C-alpha cells in the first residue's frame, strides 16, 4: 500500500480507538489459550518524550503533553502506565496520560481485581494507596518497595526485602525495553494524547504476541 492508504488506515484506527480494542482482545485471546494471569500484578510507568520547543508551525507546545520533574531533571511528554503479571510478564492492563499525572493515580486502571500480591516501586506506597488497594483488590498484599525518610533510614532487613521485590519487579521493564529501545517509541510520533495512545496500545498488543503468542501461532514447520 502507498503512504496515503497507510495514513487513512492509521486515522481509521485512531478514530475508532482500535489500538485499545486490539490490546484488550489480544490479551483475552492469549489468556483463553493458556497464558494465565496469576495473583500478582506489577505496576509501573515510563515517560515518552515530546518536543518541548515552540519552534513549530503552531508556535506552541503540544497542549495535551505536560512536564514533570524526575530526580533533578524536567521531562515533557506523556506516560505509559502498565499492569504486568508477576509470573508470566503479560501486560494485562495499560493506560496513557500526560507526564504530570502521578504514577499511583492510575492504579485503578492497572489491576484486574483478583490480585493477591501487588508490586510497585516506592511511588506506589502510602496510606491512601493502601486504602485504595483494599477497594480494588481486597485480597492483595502490598509488596511495594519501602521508602526511607530523613529521620527513618531503611534497616538492612528492609533493604534486603526491597532487593527481593525489585527482582520480581524487573519483569515490568521488559515490555518497556522492547517498546522504547527496540521499537523506537522513546518519543511521541504525533501531536495529542489520543493518536499516541492508539500507537502505544497497538504496540503493547504486539509485544504480548511477540512474548507470549506461541499458543496462537503454533510451531512453524518447514514445508
Where are these regions (language model features)?
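Polybasic low-complexity intrinsically disordered regions
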Residues: 1-139, 145, 201-207, 213, ...
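Helix-centered, glycine/charged polyanion-binding patches within enzymatic domains
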Residues: 112, 116-117, 122-198
